Amino acid sequence: MKLTMVLSVAFATLTFANEGILTFEGLGLARRQTICHTPGGSGCRASISGDQCCCTSCTPEDCSDLCKNGKQAAHEAQKQKKCAKCCNAGGESHELCCSIASAGIDCNPCTAGLRMC
C-alpha cells in the first residue's frame, strides 16, 4: 500500500512538472487529430481557432505548414477587418485607412498625426 501511494505521488509529480503535457500543444499529432473539429473532406486539412490549429490526415510537417500559413492568412484577414472598420468610422480614402491600419496606428487620421481634419 505504501509503495502504491509513493508511486502515485511520483507519477503525479512528474506529470504536473511537465506543463507541456497539460497543454493542447503538448499533445501529440495523433491525439490532436482525434479531438479537433476539422472541416469535412479528404486529404490533409486544418482548422484554426485562435492560437489552436488542428489537423486531420496530415504528416507533422504538412500540419505545421498548414497551420503556419493559415495563421498568417487569419492575421491578414484581421488587418483587413481593421482597415474596413477604420474607413467606415471616418469616411477617409480606402488607401489611407489601410496604410494607417496596417501600420498599427490609430485609425483616426487626426489622432494619428495626419493633418486632414
From Swiss-Prot:
Induction: Expression is induced in planta during disease development and peaks at 3 days post-inoculation correlating with the onset of necrotic lesion development. Expression is increased in the absence of toxin A (ToxA). GO terms for molecular function: chitin binding; pathogen-derived receptor ligand activity. Disruption phenotype: Impairs pathogenicity on differential wheat lines harboring the Snn1 gene. GO terms for cellular component: extracellular region. Disulfide bonds join 36-87, 44-55, 53-58, 54-98, 63-83, 67-117, 86-97, 107-110. It is found in: Secreted. GO terms for biological process: effector-mediated activation of plant hypersensitive response by symbiont. Residues 1-17 form the signal peptide. Residues 87-117 are annotated as: Chitin-binding domain. The host Snn1 gene confers susceptibility to strains of the necrotrophic pathogen Parastagonospora nodorum that produce the Tox1 protein. Interacts with host cell wall-associated kinase receptor Snn1. Necrotrophic effector that plays a critical role during fungal penetration, via its interaction with the host Snn1 protein. Snn1 is a member of the wall-associated kinase class of receptors, which are known to drive pathways for biotrophic pathogen resistance. Recognition of Tox1 by Snn1 induces mitogen-activated protein kinase genes such as MAPK3 and activates programmed cell death, which allows this necrotroph to gain nutrients and sporulate. Recognition of Tox1 by Snn1 also induces other plant defense responses, including oxidative burst and pathogenesis related (PR) gene expression. This is Cysteine rich necrotrophic effector Tox1. It comes from Phaeosphaeria nodorum (strain SN15 / ATCC MYA-4574 / FGSC 10173). The lineage of its organism: Eukaryota, Fungi, Dikarya, Ascomycota, Pezizomycotina.
